[in-house]
From Swiss-Prot:
PANTHER family: 50S RIBOSOMAL PROTEIN L36 2, LARGE RIBOSOMAL SUBUNIT PROTEIN BL36B. GO terms for biological process: translation. Coiled coil: none annotated. Belongs to the bacterial ribosomal protein bL36 family. One of its GO terms (molecular function) is structural constituent of ribosome. It comes from Beijerinckia indica subsp. indica (strain ATCC 9039 / DSM 1715 / NCIMB 8712). The gene is rpmJ. GO terms for cellular component: ribonucleoprotein complex; ribosome. It comes from the Bacteria. SUPFAM superfamilies: Ribosomal protein L36. Signal peptide: none annotated. Keywords: Ribonucleoprotein, Ribosomal protein. This is Large ribosomal subunit protein bL36. InterPro entries: Ribosomal_bL36, Ribosomal_bL36_sp, Ribosomal_L36_bact.
Amino acid sequence: MKVRNSLKSLRTRHRDNRLVRRKGRVYIINKTQKRYKARQG
């Protein structure tokens, strides 16, 4: 999992990317392309 400052640019790179909030943190998850998994930090 990558830690990025801004997830908006990452989200637009693949159409299956989902933005989720868990425990006060923002995550990008992608079921089909696992390499797009990231957390905002």
